[in-house]
Amino acid sequence: MPVQTAVVVLAAGAGTRMRSKTPKVLHTLGGRTMLAHSLHAAAEVDPAHLVTVVGHDKERVGAAVGALETELGRPITVAVQEEQNGTGHAVECGLSALPADFRGTVLVTAADVPLLDGHTLHALVDEHRSEPTPAAVTVLTFTAPEPTGYGRIVRLPHDGEIAEIVEEADATEEQAAITEVNAGVYAFDAEFLRTALGQLNANNAQGELYLTDVVKIARASGAPVFAAHLSDSAKVAGANDRVQLSRLAAELNRRTVENWMRAGVTVVDPSTTWIDVGVTLGRDVTIHPGVQLLGTTTVGEDAVIGPDTTLTDVSVGDGASVVRTHGSESTIGAGATVGPFSYLRPGTVLGASGKLGAFVETKNADIGAHSKVPHLTYVGDATIGEYSNIGASSVFVNYDGVAKSRTVVGSHVRTGSDTMFVAPVQVGDGAYTGAGTVLRFDVPPGALAVSGGKQRNIDGWVQRNRPGTPAAEAASAAGPHHSSDLHETEKQDLKDGIEQ
């Protein structure tokens, strides 16, 4: 029977150096919380049991774990460390959440090392089981030129094997000079770990139960202790404050961008491009400077994104072009063009080969294939059919002060500039509207809708009502000009109406 693996993720710390109301492990980078990064990596080991130890703000962190259960599609047990009494105590809490008869490998990792990946955890487990007699403990180590803050790996002089891990606060001057340090990631034999945890004591500078003391206990009992040395130290770098978090975010992004370039994506300026780990890109995508692709955004093959574009949870079809656009929770069809300066709000669906042009804002809008909204338009709560064109400066008036209503525009519709669609209203297939039309009623298919009366001019209105202004002086200098004659009553009616 294959040896089973259980993973215990430590997420109980307060993270006071973050100086935040948000628990440290719930701070984000690359579109995921540090906790999510750790649990994703743990899930790649395909453990029989996955446990997260929570403590500080346990309700909030526990809720985040619950959400990740759904995301990962596997159960995650939450163990509570009520009193923060060191890493040894935290692991004891996690171990108590495992079945009492569990006899496999216990992998222990931390929730604040977001670059640690499943490949590294697999390698640690393989090293732990590599000998005919499996190790009691296998420690992941790395070399740190500046080892401040890390536990030092003390090796035996005669064979170079690990003798103990000494925490910095307890290290002698000679031990403090050691540059091989503890990464805080371990593989344990479950039976040995249960026994060793019962032998821990708090006789140290911190007055806590150190998990690292388990190594010394193993050595004293003659149990095998292995080490797996990691050359890529960034994978186990922690984030204790926001400065460290920002550095890790930049490093994670650098790796993500480079991975996509190696996979066939052109990134013109990697230094100004940010791509979350949940993003998916097709081959031959081109990303111009100043682009942020966030959340679960997907971009199809041959699409061109940017410059200066932010897309969050947006699906972009093959061959589409998106320029200087801000979009979220939207769909852009294959071959469509968006921008510059477009704003796609949640619920926007742009069909294949459609167009949203300069200074167009959309929300809850379904715009059919080959339809165009070229410029200066708001489309909210609307359905537009195929091959339609919405004139410049049009507004879909979707809110009456109490509730929102929907506008439906058919296919092959042409609307003039400055058309107002006062919802709820429907425009039939093939209909036209004149410029400046206010649509308050449905338009039948093939009809031309025009609102407003005949233009009428009131001669001399500016000179009479705005005397002394530059406009009045300019009008007087232009000389007398008379519009078509109006009945005196009409003139007075117009004069009164405008002056009101």
From Swiss-Prot:
It holds the Pfam family NTP_transf_3. Residues 264-500 are annotated as: N-acetyltransferase. The keyword Protein biosynthesis does not apply. It is an enzyme of class 2 (transferase). Catalyzes the last two sequential reactions in the de novo biosynthetic pathway for UDP-N-acetylglucosamine (UDP-GlcNAc). The C-terminal domain catalyzes the transfer of acetyl group from acetyl coenzyme A to glucosamine-1-phosphate (GlcN-1-P) to produce N-acetylglucosamine-1-phosphate (GlcNAc-1-P), which is converted into UDP-GlcNAc by the transfer of uridine 5-monophosphate (from uridine 5-triphosphate), a reaction catalyzed by the N-terminal domain. In the N-terminal section; belongs to the N-acetylglucosamine-1-phosphate uridyltransferase family. In the C-terminal section; belongs to the transferase hexapeptide repeat family. This is Bifunctional protein GlmU.
